[in-house]
């Protein structure tokens, strides 16, 4: 792309998620491209998108030998009945489709970030992979109000920070998955997260106790009036004195 905004040219055209950096002098870029189930292949590209050097192309054979399997990226429908939302599903180690598995949701509602991104090395992947190793099905979901989508999607919980990520969307997605996959026991669902995820986990079990049977809230910011007020005001507007974010 030229400095005046003209001449925009796409140099990659595939289904991968790309993370590219270029040196100050330009001329080439280092591109790391992956999906949720394909590790990042790192290459040096020239200005036309042609591969100059392949730096690394890791595989998953060693992980699979330990019982690991990649998460499935899925699409579901939000609680409004029309908005598409996305998530990741980890099958338990030793998966048997004839069994029924309890579900653990690992939540991080943002709203400054998203939880179930499209790349291989997304934030907090280690936790649900550990739950899968222990015999649980694990999910991560990005409901309305999380980042990385349209402005309208992100603004869903603006001024309503307590509902960042739209917990009702998470419930709708898990129930939809339960209909899609009978081996998911949606009568036994737990939830956990840290920081904003800890807040969301506690709120989930208090607000929807009929659905979430147990919650583990780690380092939750349960009073955003005293936790990084500057951060909270980005997504809630200016906090009044003694304001409480439900």
Model-identified regions with their sequence ranges:
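Short coil/turn segments at beta-strand junctions that form active-site/ligand-binding loops
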Residues: 99-101, 187-188
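Active-site-proximal cap/loop segments of hydrolase catalytic domains
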Residues: 106, 124-134, 140-246
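Structured core elements
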Residues: 10, 29-31, 44, 75, ...
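Active-site donor-binding loop signature of nucleotide-sugar glycosyltransferases
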Residues: 13, 57, 78, 109, ...
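Non-catalytic accessory segments flanking enzyme active sites
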Residues: 3, 7-99, 123, 129-133, ...
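Short, glycine-/Ser/Thr-/acidic-enriched flexible segments
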Residues: 36, 49, 81, 92-95, ...
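The serine-hydrolase catalytic nucleophile loop
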Residues: 100-101, 109-128, 143
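Short, solvent-exposed loop/turn and secondary-structure capping segments
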Residues: 41, 99-100, 114-119, 149-152, ...
């Amino acid at each position: 792309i030229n400095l005046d905004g003209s001449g925009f040219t796409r140099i990659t055209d595939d289904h991968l998620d790309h993370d590219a950096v270029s040196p100050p002098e330009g001329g080439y870029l280092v591109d790391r491209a992956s999906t949720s189930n394909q590790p990042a292949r790192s290459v040096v590209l020239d200005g036309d998108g042609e591969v100059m050097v392949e730096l690394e192309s890791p595989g998953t054979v060693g992980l699979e030998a330990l019982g690991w399997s990649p998460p499935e990226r899925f699409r579901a429908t939000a609680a409004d009945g029309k908005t598409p939302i996305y998530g990741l599903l980890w099958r338990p180690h030793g998966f048997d489709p004839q069994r029924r598995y309890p579900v653990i949701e690992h939540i991080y509602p943002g709203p400054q970030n998203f939880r179930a991104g499209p790349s291989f090395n997304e934030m907090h992947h280690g936790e649900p992979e550990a739950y899968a190793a222990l015999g649980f099905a694990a999910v991560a979901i990005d409901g309305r109000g999380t980042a990385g989508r349209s402005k309208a999607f992100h603004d869903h919980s603006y001024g309503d920070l307590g509902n960042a990520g739209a917990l009702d969307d998470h419930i709708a997605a898990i129930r939809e998955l339960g209909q899609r996959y009978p081996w998911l026991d949606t009568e036994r669902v737990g939830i956990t997260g840290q920081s904003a995820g800890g807040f969301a986990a506690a709120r989930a079990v208090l607000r929807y106790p009929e659905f979430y049977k147990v919650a583990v809230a780690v380092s939750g910011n349960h009073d955003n009036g005293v936790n990084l007020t500057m951060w909270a005001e980005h997504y809630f507007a200016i906090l009044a004195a003694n304001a409480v974010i439900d």
